Curated annotation (Swiss-Prot):
GO terms for cellular component: cytosol. SUPFAM superfamilies: Class II aaRS and biotin synthetases, Nucleic acid-binding proteins. Binds 3 Mg(2+) ions per subunit. CDD domains: LysRS_core, LysRS_N. Homodimer. This is Lysine--tRNA ligase. Its cofactor is Mg(2+). InterPro entries: Aa-tRNA-synt_II (IPR004364), aa-tRNA-synth_II (IPR006195), aa-tRNA-synth_II/BPL/LPL (IPR045864), Lys-tRNA-ligase_II (IPR002313), Lys-tRNA-ligase_II_bac/euk (IPR034762), Lys-tRNA-ligase_II_N (IPR044136), Lys-tRNA-synth_II_C (IPR018149), NA-bd_OB-fold (IPR012340). It comes from Shigella boydii serotype 4 (strain Sb227). Coiled coil: none annotated. Mg(2+) 1 binds at E415, E422.
Amino acid sequence: MSEQHAQGADAVVDLNNELKTRREKLANLREQGIVFPNDFRRDHTSDQLHAEFDGKENEELEALNIEVAVAGRMMTRRIMGKASFVTLQDVGGRIQLYVARDDLPEGVYNEQFKKWDLGDILGAKGKLFKTKTGELSIHCTELRLLTKALRPLPDKFHGLQDQEARYRQRYLDLISNDESRNTFKVRSQILSGIRQFMVNRGFMEVETPMMQVIPGGAAARPFITHHNALDLDMYLRIAPELYLKRLVVGGFERVFEINRNFRNEGISVRHNPEFTMMELYMAYADYKDLIELTESLFRTLAQDILGKTEVTYGDVTLDFGKPFEKLTMREAIKKYRPETDMADLDNFDSAKAIAESIGIHVEKSWGLGRIVTEIFEEVAEAHLIQPTFITEYPAEVSPLARRNDINPEITDRFEFFIGGREIGNGFSELNDAEDQAQRFLDQVAAKDAGDDEAMFYDEDYVTALEHGLPPTAGLGIGIDRMVMLFTNSHTIRDVILFPAMRPVK
């Protein structure tokens, strides 16, 4: 047996012994009738204590004679005879406990506390003081076991090293990894910040169906489910767009929704089949208004959450404080592939030749607009590090966007890129019911030709447009990718609490 295998076997034996010992301790607690109490009430979290009292000297704390009650998980313990120091972790961070035998009721220190394990959840009451090293601590006069942990924590020095385990057992990741906890706190702040920003601009938050008879609003492969009561196949939504625009038809002129979308596609550092989007629709506005709104949203969130408009992402600094760059799709192709003859992008055969020369397999169902878009994605997208708006998307790849008044082959649409990734997509909405019907027919033809991401024909949505959709602009922003930027995370799994994983066999 190799040394590595021997160490692994020893680790399994040690774990089994640990589990056995902890269960025996729980059995003893059950016999004493003191297991899993639910009557302890704390009055402070660790961050509240640090914020209020870190700046005070020990003499001042003694004079104030402040008694507090805290609760949390025991992360470390140093037993030094008749006294011990404990690190207690709660939602706000960590606080140190000073536990002395003679300051607790008789028997608690030796017969209870010393038999508890790391990972156990404790309740503690006592008075605040500072140690000789200046660390804010609680001198305990009451200590109770609230929850017995039957499994040990990850190694305190190395944390949870197995990346797969971090995602599968997120609870362990959150216990042992400060960075992960902070990531999801920032995520929550971003969601709250978006909602406040939108409400301040007069938008109403709404909810639309997650299960749909016809999936629409994006080019993607849907998940299929079955509604037993209706005996009807349904689809998990790929986007809420068409329902939100129905609401604008109905008179709700500014609406937004933050919720999940589902796309039955590949998994990568940027893609999870279940992801969170914010979509908004604003009547009597165009895509240029959304460009201003998007810039303001990112600038506001950065300032409010991070306290600055410069955000570190990898080895670059993203600047949300200055105006974002704006390029047309063709300008971006030319910028990052200077040898491109712009006239070639107006000719199907020439554009196809360019695409094939850079390794793109051109499908038979693609038209010129799709080919130009694929060229852009291949040669330019990865270079769009600083916040950049790309405009003038071909109508062929924008079946829901309004055609440009001057050039009907392109649409009044933009996509928003940061860090080489698409973060958002917005456009002036197509409100011509007849044009929309024809574009749906074009999508049906593309689907019949083998494009399984082409859209379905949504007759009810066309009917809604026939009742009149005001001039409207719509925007969708990927929340997960936004959180990646704000937390310097480089895989989407790091910002989704429970990402999609293949089951362990």
